[in-house]
Regions:
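Alpha-helical linker/hinge and terminal dimerization helices associated
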Residues: 10-13, 17-20, 54, 97, ...
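Short, hydrophobic-biased segments on the C-terminal half of alpha helices
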Residues: 47, 65-66
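Pre-recognition alpha-helix immediately N-terminal to the DNA-recognition helix
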Residues: 5, 12, 32-36, 96
């Protein structure tokens, strides 16, 4: 398969995933934040860690976090050892939202590949990225 065709297929996958991310309730950035805070260890659930993970500014990350807090998906808690720092955790509403995460469409598609295909795909994508 020519490189251009492969690149077009990757672009199409990206568009499909992006389109799935707009569910009318949360934006793709907000979905990414929910996934991050659900997986991160308690000491990494900070605005700075999320900004670094997203490779964005702290201001942009904070806007996403504030929207999720306002929507009742995240709650902010001060660290017991340092009251100036905060840890963010998912609320029950945030956990319920993740149960219907549109990203799972892609996860299921990749899961439909056999182990050899998934390994080859992962290696190829690592090389591309």
């Amino acid at each position: 398969m020519p490189a251009r065709k492969t690149a077009e297929l990757l672009l199409q996958v990206g568009r499909l995933v992006q389109a799935e991310g707009y569910d009318g309730e949360l934006s793709p950035a907000q979905w990414m934040a929910l996934r991050f805070f659900a997986r991160a260890n308690p000491f990494s659930r900070t605005p700075s860690a999320f900004a670094e993970f997203q490779a964005t500014t702290r201001g942009t990350a904070t806007q996403t976090i504030k929207a999720l807090e306002a929507g009742g998906y995240l709650v902010r808690q001060p660290f017991k050892t340092d009251g100036r720092s905060v840890s963010l955790r998912l609320t029950s509403k945030g956990k319920k939202a993740l149960a219907r995460d549109p990203f799972e469409v892609l996860v299921r598609a990749v899961d439909s590949l056999d182990a050899t295909e998934r390994t080859a795909m992962r290696r190829a994508l690592h090389q591309v990225l």
